[in-house]
């Protein structure tokens, strides 16, 4: 099976003719159209994408097979996935979120902190959510070189230098 990466989500219908409001997770939002066809997470549906215009909160787009507002509304919240081999290779110091999720995270002394469970981007930069055995709560860690000096995808590990935790 082809490995896929989440590249966007449908935020809802736009207009009355089946157009959708698309939220792109790609570094250049318009690049999402170049990765067509895009698939639903379960892989049961695929869409070719034609971007129509910028809209508040994303991009207006036409999806193949979506002709009415009702069909577009039914897709609200659906994530869109691209074949991994269609995505560009990244420089050495950049990573796809999908590659980081599940990696073990160790502090600079070698103690296991947990695993990356999720990654959030609220505009100011990525935040790693780390959870593991013995943790009472998740550790939210800015994904910057200061806090995460080493990412070794081949070894499946991250070395982090988190701030002191407050009790």
UniProtKB/Swiss-Prot annotation:
Which stretches make up the PRC barrel domain? 92-166
One Pfam family for this entry, by name? RimM
The record's SUPFAM superfamilies line, in alphabetical order, gives:
PRC-barrel domain, Translation proteins
Per UniProt, subunit arrangement is:
Binds ribosomal protein uS19.
**InterPro entries per UniProt:** PRC_barrel-like_sf, PRC_RimM, RimM, RimM_N, RimM_N_sf, Transl_B-barrel_sf
GO-annotated cellular components: cytoplasm; ribosome
Name listed for the protein in its UniProt record? Ribosome maturation factor RimM
Q: Where in the cell is it found?
A: Cytoplasm
Q: Which PANTHER family match?
A: RIBOSOME MATURATION FACTOR RIMM
What family classification does the UniProt entry report for this protein? Belongs to the RimM family.
Keywords, A to Z, come to: Chaperone, Cytoplasm, Ribosome biogenesis, rRNA processing
Q: What job does this protein perform?
A: An accessory protein needed during the final step in the assembly of 30S ribosomal subunit, possibly for assembly of the head region. Essential for efficient processing of 16S rRNA. May be needed both before and after RbfA during the maturation of 16S rRNA. It has affinity for free ribosomal 30S subunits but not for 70S ribosomes.
Any domain commentary? The PRC barrel domain binds ribosomal protein uS19.
**A single GO molecular function term of this UniProt record:** ribosome binding
Q: Which GO terms describe its biological process?
A: ribosomal small subunit biogenesis; rRNA processing
